UniProtKB/Swiss-Prot annotation:
Gene3D superfamilies reported in the protein's UniProt record: Glycogen Phosphorylase B
Function: Synthesizes alpha-1,4-glucan chains using ADP-glucose.
Keywords from the UniProt entry: Glycogen biosynthesis, Glycosyltransferase, Transferase
CDD domains: GT5_Glycogen_synthase_DULL1-like
UniProt record, GO biological process: glycogen biosynthetic process
Gene: glgA
Organism this protein belongs to: Burkholderia thailandensis (strain ATCC 700388 / DSM 13276 / CCUG 48851 / CIP 106301 / E264)
Biased composition regions of type Basic and acidic residues, renumbered to the chain: 512-525
Family membership: Belongs to the glycosyltransferase 1 family. Bacterial/plant glycogen synthase subfamily.
GO molecular function, one term: alpha-1,4-glucan glucosyltransferase (ADP-glucose donor) activity
Protein name, as recorded: Glycogen synthase
SUPFAM superfamilies xrefs: UDP-Glycosyltransferase/glycogen phosphorylase (SSF53756)
Length: 533
């Protein structure tokens, strides 16, 4: 059972929602019986398929009468349970904030309730005819589940806690602990107390049977003071129970050949439609119609974490150095940054387009229509936007940190296989380092269009699916529950074997043309490496 605060398309503020939708889908394809438990936001209740009430739980916490509404995810059919409590979840504003962008004052209560209900379901106390062998909780919103189930003995399911972002800790007043039903013996520095506060994230990291992060590099980084946000000692102490598993993406949803939100389809074998997507995006955003202009995009939260402040500071000089360059930004975040980018768009009409907010369909069109994705980060647990970009043949520029370091291979650091090139990488979180990477990328785009096209195909060829990572999670679950999960694990492995046989048969049918294309790409990749120096 997944416990999460959001899952696409029912509710989304960021990459967490994408993972909590696409990973269950991939696990189901391997034979795993997965359910997702999340809050019943108004938008989720509107979008879920075939909703029906399956449990009336009464007051799980004082003043919070709860029922569970079952349904399924659109498109994937993954079963979902929505925690229905209108006073807590059906509100104006976003999932975590009010209309004024301030966090809801009762967020500890809102997500404490989610964890309490998850614990009841996990222990068979919710009146449902299903119990999980493993509860997989995500980020601080699900951090209390392992604590709330710890005293159940053999009836307790195993718990996995995934840290998607160690900076978001879910810290609240320690007085909130009694209201959300936490045991008094856990309210110490050896439990959930963190510098005088209650920390949901620390609870998950302290009590879960296994911990994961969303990339191998980030798993190491959070054990250091630079990235651990005060909990690095706990992460280091649990290093033997900590795994870094790279996020994947839903390659059916993110597929330029079938994407219903694109004006023209295209594929690695026929890139012609990408030019049409670029022209349509320029028209949609009010940019100059210029097929040869390097169109740089950024789709992210506007925060210092994403180096949005550096992008805003350095973009004018980049526009001056590259007179044809265009820039498109889509996202929301810090109000001062939003206003700064809006002002920049007014200063550079027809060259800079800014769309504050988040529209999933526009995000698809930007990833398809842009030439370059600029995605700096002071820290980045995994990052999904660079995976979407590569899937769509848009070249990412990223900082060598976290999951960005694990997923993007820079042209100038290739050794020995040039066919692994997927983008441009810089090291320091500075304007100079980012600007130099952008210069290298734009120069290659402008000077060597044939080589650029080959690089785009190399990026598209990268496997960003959940295939390998979903199997890693399945192995983790099976290791936690060897006696309870032997039969189910065999079923899952049988499904995986069937998929492998089908893939092998498909590969045999395509082997000759694929090898020919790969050799051609290798030759072009070597030209790319030379051209970038």
């Amino acid at each position: 059972m997944f416990v999460a605060s959001e899952a696409f398309p029912l509710a989304k503020t960021g990459g967490l929602a994408d993972v909590c939708a696409s990973l269950p889908k991939a696990l189901r394809a391997l034979g795993c019986d997965v359910r997702v438990l999340m809050p019943g936001y108004a938008q989720a209740l509107d979008r879920v398929l075939r909703p029906r009430v399956v449990a009336e739980l009464g007051e799980v916490l004082p003043g919070a009468a709860v029922r569970i509404i079952a349904g399924s995810m659109p498109d994937s059919g993954v079963p979902v349970w929505l925690l229905d409590c209108p006073s807590l979840y059906r509100r104006a504003g976003s999932l975590y904030c009010g209309p004024d962008d301030a966090d809801w004052a009762d967020n500890a209560y809102r997500f404490g309730l989610l964890c309490q209900v998850a614990a009841r379901v996990a222990l068979g106390a919710a009146g449902l005819r299903w119990r999980p062998d493993v509860v997989h909780a995500h980020d601080w919103h699900g951090g209390l589940v392992a604590l709330l189930t710890r005293g159940a003995g053999d009836a307790r399911p195993k718990t996995v806690f995934t840290i998607h972002n160690a900076a978001f800790q879910g810290n609240f007043a320690l007085d909130d602990a009694a209201r959300i039903g936490l045991p008094a013996d856990a309210l110490s520095v050896d439990g959930v107390e963190f510098y005088g506060q209650l920390s949901f994230l620390k609870a998950g990291a302290r009590y879960a049977d296994r911990l994961t992060t969303v990339s191998p590099t980030y798993a190491g980084e959070i054990q250091t003071a630079e990235f651990g946000c005060g909990l690095e000692g706990l992460y280091a102490a649990r290093r033997d129970q900590l795994s870094g598993i790279m996020n994947g993406i839903d390659t059916e949803l993110w597929n330029p050949a079938t994407d219903r939100w694109l004006p023209q389809p295209y594929s690695i074998d026929d890139m012609g439609g990408k030019a049409g997507c670029k022209a349509a995006l320029q028209q949609e955003l009010g940019l100059c119609a210029d097929a040869r202009a390097p169109l740089v995009a950024s789709v992210c939260r506007l925060t210092s974490q994403k180096m949005s402040d550096i992008v805003l500071e350095r973009l004018p000089e980049q526009l001056a150095q590259h007179p044809r360059m265009q820039f498109a930004l889509h996202g929301r975040g810090d109000r001062a940054l939003e206003q700064g980018f809006d002002a920049l768009a007014a200063q550079y009409p027809r060259r800079v387009a800014v769309r504050i907010g988040y529209d999933e369909t526009l995000a698809h069109r930007i990833h398809a229509g842009a030439d370059i994705l600029l995605h700096g980060a002071r820290f980045e647990p995994c990052g999904l936007t660079q995976l979407y970009a590569m899937r769509y043949g848009t070249i990412p520029i990223v900082r060598r940190v976290g999951g960005l370091a694990d997923s993007v291979v820079d042209l100038d650091t290739l050794a020995p296989h040039s066919e692994d090139a997927t983008g441009f990488v810089f090291d320091a979180p500075t304007g100079d380092a980012m600007s130099e990477a952008l210069r290298r990328c734009v120069n290659l785009h402008d000077a060597r269009p044939g080589v650029w096209s080959a690089l785009c195909r190399l990026a598209m060829a990268r496997d960003s699916s959940w295939s390998r990572s979903a199997r890693a999670y399945l192995d983790l679950y099976a290791a936690l529950t060897p006696r309870r999960r032997v039969e189910a694990s065999d079923e899952a492995r049988g499904a995986a074997a069937a998929l492998a046989r089908a893939d092998a048969a498909s590969g045999r049918r395509r082997r000759a043309p694929e090898q020919s294309e790969r050799l051609r790409q290798e030759r072009l990749a070597r030209q790319v490496a030379l051209a970038s120096k």
